[in-house]
A protein has these predicted regions:
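Short strand-coil-strand connectors
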Residues: 42-45, 121
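Conserved active-site alpha-helix within GNAT-family acetyltransferase domains
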Residues: 17-26, 116
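Helix-adjacent hinge/juxtasegments
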Residues: 53-80
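N-terminal beta-strand motif that seeds the catalytic metal site of vicinal oxygen chelate
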Residues: 1-20, 47, 61-64, 129-134
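Residue-level structural signal for beta-strand termini and adjacent loop
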Residues: 37, 53-54, 131
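Short glycine/proline-centered loop/turn elements that form peptide/ligand docking sites
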Residues: 18, 36-39
Length: 134
């Protein structure tokens, strides 16, 4: 049933104009639709929406991520646009210059992943990842 459905993510925002500017200026997205209190965006393999919410708090875990072919190039491009990457030094998760090497992955995704995380203008934790294929 759901395995055949397209996935869509919803992210809360306290300031929709600020969120729109972030996703446009920093990430290169333009909304395909808008309504009062909401913006809808489409990617190659999915979609996401940002909605006004005064009561919801941004998460402490990754709320949305993109798979990229070259994580270093993507990090450089996003940094050039003013995106700041998270740095972690935790058991099992350490970033170097914003990028973590993660061992183990789903078999179809390779043997591991190189990943990096950043926050949007509303505090939502977003990620990019590059599968490691042996």
């Amino acid at each position: 049933m759901l395995k055949d459905a397209k996935v869509a993510t919803r992210l809360p925002a306290k300031d929709l104009n600020r969120a729109r500017a972030f996703y446009s200026e920093k990430l290169g997205f333009e909304p395909v639709e808008q309504r009062e209190g909401g913006l809808r965006y489409v990617c190659v393999a999915g979609e996401f929406a940002i909605f006004v919410s005064a009561g919801m708090q941004s998460g402490t875990h990754t709320q949305m991520s993109w798979e990229v072919d070259n994580i270093e190039a993507t990090v450089r491009e996003l940094r050039a646009r003013g995106v700041e990457f998270e740095e972690y030094d935790l058991p099992g998760l350490r970033t170097i210059d914003g990028i973590a090497e993660i061992r183990g992955n789903y078999p179809s995704k390779g043997t591991g992943e190189r990943a990096a995380w950043f926050r949007d203008s509303e505090g939502n934790l977003l990620g990019i990842g590059q599968p490691v294929r042996s």
